[in-house]
């Protein structure tokens, strides 16, 4: 009986050990949230879009993540721009955003994550502005881990590539 009680307590603690104040810095590279559950392998019910397919170095592009249906909400995210394995550029979170915050994954503001919010404040759509480094050229993809709830999450979902052009 005591064993069952201990298992129940440990399970409850695991369920509350998700990261309500944002992704841990340890998730910056692999983008795995550490929920003690396996990520979903089927395609995510979310899209990652940009209004343009190319931008000059030093310029910005809006990146939008949307659930495909109203039920496809987000409890948490970790969003980065990647060129190969490198996290590049900086993000701007809209003023007054009650869902998101910039994150330091080696450089200030080079990722976006969620912050503490009530379940009723889960989002179906979020948008952020990404600014390319002025000296960057080549393709970049926007990579996101999306958490719908503790046991339903998709890791390292990618956008179509955006070409970064020489700013000269």
Swiss-Prot record:
The keyword Secreted applies. Disulfide bonds join 28-105. Keywords: Antibiotic, Antimicrobial, Disulfide bond, Immunity, Innate immunity, Secreted, Signal. Residues 1-18 form the signal peptide. It comes from the Eukaryota. One of its GO terms (biological process) is defense response to bacterium. This is Putative defense protein 1. It is found in: Secreted. The keyword Secreted applies. Induction: By bacteria (E.coli and M.luteus). Residues 19-168 form the Reelin domain. As this protein is expressed upon bacterial infection, it may have antimicrobial activity. One of its GO terms (cellular component) is membrane. Its main location: secreted. Very highly expressed in midgut, and highly expressed in fat body, silk gland and epidermis. Pfam families: Reeler (PF02014). Belongs to the insect defense protein family. InterPro entries: Ferric-chelate_Red/DefProt, Reeler_dom, Reeler_sf.
């Amino acid at each position: 009986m005591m064993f069952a009680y201990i298992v129940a307590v440990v399970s409850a603690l695991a369920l509350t050990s998700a990261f309500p104040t944002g992704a841990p810095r340890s998730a910056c590279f692999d983008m795995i949230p550490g929920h003690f559950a396996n990520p979903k392998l089927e395609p995510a019910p979310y899209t990652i879009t940009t209004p343009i397919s190319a931008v000059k170095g030093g310029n910005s592009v809006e990146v939008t993540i949307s659930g495909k249906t109203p039920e496809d909400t987000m409890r948490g995210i970790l969003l980065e721009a990647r060129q190969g394995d490198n996290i590049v550029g900086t993000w701007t979170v809209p003023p007054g955003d009650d869902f998101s915050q910039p994150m330091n994954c080696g450089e200030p503001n080079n990722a976006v994550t969620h912050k503490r919010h009530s379940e009723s404040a889960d989002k179906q759509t979020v948008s952020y502005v990404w600014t390319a480094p002025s000296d960057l050229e080549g393709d970049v993809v926007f990579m996101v881990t999306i958490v719908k709830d503790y046991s339903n999450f998709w890791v390292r979902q990618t956008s179509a590539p955006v070409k970064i052009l020489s700013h000269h």
